[in-house]
Amino acid sequence: MLTQEDVLNALKTIIYPNFEKDIVSFGFVKNITLHDNQLGLLIEIPSSSEETSAILRENISKAMQEKGVKALNLDIKTPPKPQAPKPTTKNLAKNIKHVVMISSGKGGVGKSTTSVNLSIALANLNQKVGLLDADVYGPNIPRMMGLQNADVIMDPSGKKLIPLKAFGVSVMSMGLLYDEGQSLIWRGPMLMRAIEQMLSDIIWGDLDVLVVDMPPGTGDAQLTLAQAVPLSAGITVTTPQIVSLDDAKRSLDMFKKLHIPIAGIVENMGSFVCEHCKKESEIFGSNSMSGLLEAYNTQILAKLPLEPKVRLGGDKGEPIVISHPTSVSAKIFEKMAKDLSAFLDKVEREKLADNKDIQPTQTHAYSH
């Protein structure tokens, strides 16, 4: 007749998966009940792995059959499966009311020019505005804001930087932290850390809007910013040519995937009016954006002409909204700032800015 000792000896042959000790030595056998060749076993293991339980169930059942057990009630208790942590909103710049990402699928479309003039136009609406140059590989903001020769200022603790001021806008750029013309040869993690530091280690103070001039593309920098602060708006800058619109679509798709409210598209250099003959020429073509607008439920936030004064103002550090406030482009930037402000009010009212759903998550589980 089968005894509890026989059962226990048989269980000593059952090795716990991925270890060298048996389940009896581990103390996993909690109860044995034996009545008329009907066996009940209670096994408690520290793993929630279904594979581990299945291996033990198969090996124990086989060992008990060899002992002549006709009816086996095998209960293998496991700890509850670890729950994935609930995503939470991350915000490295809680004193900033709205963060606006100025993006483009490719370089050379006027993204920095848009960032500079939009920031000043917002400041002219009596808003507290910051301008962050996150294009660490090609920082043009210092020159465009007339700050290329300025020295950075540390706070009294010597641990944080104070933004520089130009045209009523608080400004910070990696271009202020290293010599002009010096290249940065950084891998992704260094870039990501730099962007986080420009949010957390800069004393921005209380801002209504922080405009962030991003590097071209849809990579580490964009994802890092989106995960670091809730973004209130994404704006993509493009020219009308087809290859630029193709890249603009990628930028809009990034906004959608990162849950960034899309404020609109800036069509830059759409046309050129000759100062002498007044003839208007569409240098980059006149391709329709209706498909993009419909696909991403957005609007054309501004249509800017190719105006030589814009380029000249950028080179001299005198943005056109300052140097020629009555020009066509300056008036467009002025209207753009008002339209963006209305959009940001809507985002705040409807609580659309949140980055909890794009935070990286990692579940730690005991799997043996």
Curated annotation (Swiss-Prot):
MF terms (GO), sorted A to Z: 4 iron, 4 sulfur cluster binding; ATP binding; ATP hydrolysis activity; ATP-dependent FeS chaperone activity; metal ion binding
Record flagged with keyword Ligase: no
Residue numbers binding ATP: 105-112
GO biological process terms, semicolon-separated: iron-sulfur cluster assembly
SUPFAM superfamilies reported for this sequence: Fe-S cluster assembly (FSCA) domain-like, P-loop containing nucleoside triphosphate hydrolases
Pfam families per record: FeS_assembly_P, ParA
Keyword terms: ATP-binding, Hydrolase, Iron, Iron-sulfur, Metal-binding, Nucleotide-binding
Source species, domain of life: Bacteria
Matching InterPro entries: FSCA_dom_sf (IPR034904), MIP18-like (IPR002744), Mrp-like_CS (IPR000808), Mrp/NBP35_ATP-bd (IPR019591), NUBPL-like (IPR044304), P-loop_NTPase (IPR027417), YlxH/NBP35 (IPR033756)
Quaternary assembly: Homodimer.
Protein family per UniProt: In the N-terminal section; belongs to the MIP18 family.
Record function comment: Binds and transfers iron-sulfur (Fe-S) clusters to target apoproteins. Can hydrolyze ATP.
Protein name: Iron-sulfur cluster carrier protein
Organism from which the protein derives: Helicobacter pylori (strain J99 / ATCC 700824) (Campylobacter pylori J99)
